[in-house]
């Protein structure tokens, strides 16, 4: 092991991301729907942010949380997909050790932040349906700002130790990672030392952060559904159930692939085919950013009408 391949005595200069193992011959074709999904995510989330930002009537808490969700979706997909496409189309898998850690930090912290936003959105719907008279008092702009700050602080605080846990490990020249982007356990498994601390801390973060978030979200929607079924108007019930159904669907799409990835990395590493694991890991950074503007935005009457109005004004000006 030569000094030219190592820095800080034990840290590699670069890693090499291989893409989806076992499907190398299909990389070019797999990248096409990935690219299409990324473009849809960019356009959809950017349009949602633009519509909410331009219309003062949409500066209510629910829409501000939607705007935050779209911002995190843009950040999550843009952190991973461009490099993913470069690997699948151009075989440009090399990434510096520092760049890999930076991508890992961004992916996990943004994901944790998005989990916090989904929890905040569940709380928003709970207050709106179960305590509507106090809605504007409980969720004013100052409270929303504090919720956003706490979510950001929590995500950075729980993910930052990953960097130090990975930098302490020796890698013994192991540089090839069978993945399309850098994540904590993918890097840790390249080490030639005991990674029990990494496994335990990663599992603790997953359970205490996103696991706790998902439980609180489930409790919130339990109260919401109980309140909805006691509404006197069938139209009000249908509207509330339609909104909640969209929210629950995107929450399931967000959490299920993530928990599958976390758990297989730690307990089913040899039982689950590698290409299945990596393919699902790609989907959980692609599917939510694509679906969020559709399920949360396009199905919301106020946003849909303002978007159509904005498009009409654009055509008129042309």
Curated annotation (Swiss-Prot):
Q: Which CDD domains match?
A: 7tmA_OR52B-like
**Keyword Membrane set for record:** yes
Please give the residue ranges for the topological domain Extracellular. Answer: 1-28, 79-102, 164-199, 262-277
Keyword 4Fe-4S: yes or no? no
The membrane-topology field of this record reads: Multi-pass membrane protein
Give residue spans on the Cytoplasmic membrane side: 50-57, 124-142, 221-240, 299-318
In this record, what's one Pfam family?
7tm_4
Q: Which GO biological process annotations does it have?
A: sensory perception of smell
Sorted UniProt keywords:
Cell membrane, Disulfide bond, G-protein coupled receptor, Glycoprotein, Membrane, Olfaction, Receptor, Sensory transduction, Transducer, Transmembrane, Transmembrane helix
Q: What SUPFAM superfamilies would the database entry show? A: Family A G protein-coupled receptor-like
Q: Subcellular localization, per the record?
A: Cell membrane
Q: Which GO terms describe its molecular function?
A: G protein-coupled receptor activity; olfactory receptor activity
Sugar attachment sites are 5
Q: Which residues cross the membrane?
A: 29-49, 58-78, 103-123, 143-163, 200-220, 241-261, 278-298
Any one Gene Ontology cellular component term annotated for this protein: plasma membrane
Using the UniProt record, give the first listed, main subcellular location.
membrane
Query: What are the cysteine partners in each disulfide bond?
Result: 100-192
Per the record, the similarity remark reads: Belongs to the G-protein coupled receptor 1 family.
| Physiological role | Odorant receptor.
Tell me the protein's name: Olfactory receptor 52D1
| Species of provenance | Homo sapiens
């Amino acid at each position: 092991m030569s000094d030219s391949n190592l820095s800080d005595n034990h840290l590699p200069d670069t890693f090499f991301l291989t893409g989806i193992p076992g499907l190398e011959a299909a990389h070019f074709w797999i990248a096409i729907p990935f690219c299409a999904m990324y473009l849809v995510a960019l356009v959809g989330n950017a349009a949602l942010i633009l519509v909410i930002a331009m219309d003062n009537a949409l500066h209510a808490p629910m829409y501000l949380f939607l705007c935050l969700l779209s911002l995190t979706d843009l950040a999550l997909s843009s952190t991973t997909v461009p490099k993913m496409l470069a690997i699948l189309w151009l075989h440009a898998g090399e990434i510096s050790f520092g760049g890999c850690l930076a991508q890992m930090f961004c992916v996990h912290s943004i994901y944790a932040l998005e989990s916090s936003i989904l929890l905040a959105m569940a709380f928003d719907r709970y207050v709106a349906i179960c305590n509507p008279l106090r809605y504007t008092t409980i969720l004013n702009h100052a409270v929303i700002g504090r919720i956003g700050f706490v979510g950001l602080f929590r995500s950075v605080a729980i993910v930052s130790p990953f960097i130090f846990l990975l930098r302490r490990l020796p890698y013994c020249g192991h540089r090839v990672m069978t993945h399309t982007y850098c994540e904590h356990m993918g890097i840790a498994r390249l080490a030639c030392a005991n990674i029990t601390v990494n496994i335990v801390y990663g599992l603790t973060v997953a359970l205490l952060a996103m696991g706790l978030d998902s439980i609180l979200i489930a409790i919130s929607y339990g109260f919401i559904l109980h309140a909805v079924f006691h509404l006197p108007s069938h139209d009000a019930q249908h509207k509330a159930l339609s909104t909640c159904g969209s929210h629950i669907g995107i929450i399931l799409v967000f959490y299920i692939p993530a928990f599958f990835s976390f758990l297989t990395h730690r307990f089913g590493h040899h039982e689950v085919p590698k290409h299945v694991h990596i393919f699902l890991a790609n989907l959980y950074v692609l599917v939510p950013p694509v679906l969020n503007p559709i399920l949360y935005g396009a199905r919301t009457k106020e946003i849909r009408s303002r978007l159509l109005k904005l498009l009409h004004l654009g055509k008129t000006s042309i």
